[in-house]
């Protein structure tokens, strides 16, 4: 067996000085404290070696400095949500499967949920929602094991893959429109906007938490597997894929409902601190008003987004994929009082039936 031969000669004074300068530069760049070497205690934190960077630390994506460009406006401005709408119209709801396609989609979501819970070490003190219309639809039955850090681990991982379905579906419909030499009837824009919105969720949480190397590797693998799997499935059955995303967003609404309840019940004291504010990126994107910029308010905004995605995908799963227009960007007559749109004024948790919108 080949073994590399190492030199045992002591370093010269110039070499020692160079190593000292390099170590000092590294410590200064990453804001490391200047202390003596101590025994390393292995971390028991699952899935990540990251650290919270809300107030102090290294910004993962600082604002670039350009000479003439002052700011870049979002490609899809976020529709306004009122506080009353987010708290009264958004709640956990489950659409019961009606055919084999729905059951396949629901089964895949439940399997994915189990895999994600196992990978992120997610454990909560609940069993099941009480009722579909209860915004606090949980019952505590187990010892509480979550924390702010564990919630951020879950948020970052989930949002890193949540933006995949909209991008894949929009890309495939775009390519089909090109090769078919026909219009898409407004689906592409809504799907790409959904992917953009999920990415903004991820960027918001990355302003509060920096994932470690292991988590980055897991995200890379999960994205590769999920992208290719969803790509192939959408080629064969786009209806099943939209139903899958609808059920996936049901789980997202439940996840954020649980975290909001934890915060309101005092289990997450760091986020309940009045000095803990939402990142500037989130305040600008959602247009969060003064007095409603806390972590609790941020979770309400994100949960409302997930509820909107749930409505959109359950609705798209009810339509004829090749010929029906997208009802969320369509213009209806004045005689139609209740109609879908980009906001949550007429939110339907289980989606719109085809007969209601076409």
Swiss-Prot record:
In which residues is Fe cation 1 bound?
159, 198, 201, 306
How the protein sits in the membrane? Multi-pass membrane protein
User: Where found in the cell?
Assistant: Mitochondrion inner membrane
User: What Pfam families would the database entry show?
Assistant: AOX
| Entry's Gene Ontology cellular component terms | mitochondrial inner membrane
Q: Which residues bind Fe cation 2?
A: 198, 249, 306, 309
Ranges that cross the membrane: 152-172, 218-238
Q: Which GO terms describe its biological process?
A: alternative respiration
Task: Supply the enzyme class, top level.
Answer: oxidoreductase
Name the EC number(s): 1.-.-.-
Query: How is its cofactor bound, per UniProt?
Result: Binds 2 iron ions per subunit.
Family listed = Belongs to the alternative oxidase family.
What this protein is called in its record is Alternative oxidase, mitochondrial
């Amino acid at each position: 067996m080949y073994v590399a031969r190492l030199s045992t000669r002591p370093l010269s004074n110039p070499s020692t000085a160079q190593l000292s300068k390099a170590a000092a530069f590294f410590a200064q760049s990453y804001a490391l404290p200047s202390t003596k070497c101590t025994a390393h205690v292995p971390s028991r934190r699952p899935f990540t070696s990251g650290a919270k960077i809300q107030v102090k630390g290294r910004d993962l994506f600082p604002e670039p400095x350009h000479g003439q460009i002052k700011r870049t406006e979002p490609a899809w401005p976020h529709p306004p949500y009122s506080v009353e709408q987010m708290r009264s119209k958004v709640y956990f709801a489950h659409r019961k499967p009606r055919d084999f396609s729905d059951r396949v989609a629901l089964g895949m979501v439940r399997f994915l949920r189990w895999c994600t819970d196992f990978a992120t070490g997610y454990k909560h003190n609940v069993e099941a929602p009480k009722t579909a219309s209860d915004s606090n639809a949980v019952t505590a039955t187990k010892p509480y094991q979550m924390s702010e850090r564990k919630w951020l681990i879950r948020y970052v991982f989930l949002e890193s893959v949540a933006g995949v379905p909209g991008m894949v579906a929009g890309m495939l419909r775009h390519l089909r429109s090109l090769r078919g030499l026909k219009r898409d009837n407004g689906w592409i824009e809504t799907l790409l906007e959904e992917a953009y919105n999920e990415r903004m969720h991820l960027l918001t949480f990355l302003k509060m938490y920096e994932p470690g190397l292991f988590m980055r590797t897991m995200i890379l693998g999960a994205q590769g597997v999920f992208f290719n799997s969803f790509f192939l499935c959408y080629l064969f059955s786009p209806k099943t894929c939209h139903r899958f995303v609808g059920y996936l967003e049901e789980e997202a609404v439940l996840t954020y409902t649980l975290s909001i309840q934890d915060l309101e019940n005092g289990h997450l004291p760091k986020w309940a601190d009045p000095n803990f504010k939402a990142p500037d990126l989130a305040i600008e994107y959602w247009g969060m008003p003064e007095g409603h910029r806390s972590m609790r308010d941020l979770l309400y905004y994100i949960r409302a987004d997930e509820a909107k995605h749930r409505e959109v995908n359950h609705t798209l799963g009810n339509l004829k994929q090749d010929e029906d227009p997208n009802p969320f960007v369509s213009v209806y007559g004045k005689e139609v009082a209740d109609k879908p749109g980009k906001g949550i004024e007429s939110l339907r948790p289980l989606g719109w039936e085809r007969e209601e919108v076409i």
